[in-house]
Amino acid sequence: MNDQINELQLKIERLENEISFKNGLISILSHDSKEMFGNFLWLIEALEDKTINEEDFFNLLPQIKSDARKNLQTIQDSTAWLKTQYGDFKIKPVKILVIDLFHHFEEKYADQLKEKSIKFHFKGDPNAFLTTDRLLLEYVLDKILNNAVKYSLPGQDIYLQEATEGDQVILSVIDSGTGIAEKYLSAIYSYDNPVFQGTSGEKGVGLSLKIVKNFVSLLQGNIQIISAENKGTTVSLFLSKFTE
């Protein structure tokens, strides 16, 4: 009887978490979309009514572009998550060399790394591998690395580190950027966490890490974030070497 009660409690907690996640997702999409389109409409009407001159109009375009990019990222993140909610979604494990992941992101982030003079390094066994869903893992690492670049200062280093312990592979993205104050760490996966600007004014969307945690669970793994203000952040993924 106790086992059945415990199982029901776990199911209730899981459903409550899913409902909370979906409600938060709808709230973010609604708020951000209204804000962005409201800004677009105001800017166009101001230009039509000649209450803003062309110089001020063009000066505001970089901010509008930044807001549009942020909202596009929110939609892309939401779409990625929604695909995992379809009834026929299944993990598709394939063998992945960790060094291949490094080279993939080294190429993908080449322009951003160059722009901020950041060096990207690999630490670990170049022959290390794991068998898991490549799309989900790449999404997770992409969001973590994106934050590392965003919150690193020009000239700093970022590492993708691999460590294999028995049947477990630990992948860590390590930076020495602005870090996160301890008071914010406990809320890092909630919808109440603050959204910080990157070191070059980049905007966060406040959603990616919530989806990252969800995807890591789908990969039957765990995520750990260790961070200190002005000392950098280490985000580690604890994954099974073989995922069924």
For every predicted segment, state its role:
Residues 92-96, 114, 119-128:
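Conserved catalytic submotifs in the C-terminal HATPase_c
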